């Protein structure tokens, strides 16, 4: 769902940051 997509994006950003 949308929540899963957002969580994936946030996870990627946190991984890079």
Curated annotation (Swiss-Prot):
Pfam families: Antimicrobial_8. Coiled coil: none annotated. InterPro entries: Antimicrobial_8. The keyword Iron does not apply. GO terms for biological process: defense response to bacterium. Transmembrane segments: none annotated. It comes from Uperoleia inundata. Shows a medium antibacterial activity against L.mesenteriodes. The modification Alanine amide is found at residue 17. It is found in: Secreted. Keywords: Amidation, Amphibian defense peptide, Antibiotic, Antimicrobial, Secreted. Expressed by the skin dorsal glands. One of its GO terms (cellular component) is extracellular region. This is Uperin-4.1.
